[in-house]
UniProtKB/Swiss-Prot annotation:
Listed GO CC annotations: axonemal B tubule inner sheath; sperm flagellum
Keywords: Cell projection, Cilium, Cytoplasm, Cytoskeleton, Flagellum
Subcellular location: Cytoplasm, Cytoskeleton, Flagellum axoneme
Protein's organism: Bos taurus (Bovine)
Pfam families: SPMIP10-like (PF14983)
InterPro entries xrefs: SPMIP10 (IPR027965)
Protein function: Microtubule inner protein (MIP) part of the dynein-decorated doublet microtubules (DMTs) in flagellum axoneme, which is required for flagellum beating. May serve to reinforce and thus stabilize the microtubule structure in the sperm flagella. Involved in the regulation of sperm motility.
Name of the protein: Sperm-associated microtubule inner protein 10
Amino acid sequence: MASGKDTCPILPKLTNNCSDENSDKLANKCEIHLPRFSLKQGMIPRHYVMPWKQNMKFRNVNLKHAEACGIHAGPLEDSLFLDHSERLCHGEDRKVVLKKGPPEIKIADMPLHSPLSRYQSTVISHGFRRRLI
């Protein structure tokens, strides 16, 4: 019993003025992002927001610099540290950060247990192996 009155009105067609690059950026903005955090550590602060994100006087300039450098400046993820964990999803790549520091001797086959160890520090060796990954 559908009549002509029950149909939806015809909507005007929108012109597509966007280039392919802009449509890719819009598609990327609609993706769901789940933040990643490191394990909880006592030395990491409970909550820390970078000062340049709180500076309202030069906010537009700071956002332009962040965009030029490829740093995420979204409103939902302001904190660099949250609940004694470090945010891992919008920072520098971990391998790049490790290259900036002093060179270290990397032992790939470090034993997990040594009978000569006074404290049998398996926790330290596990942490070392985890950092190599």
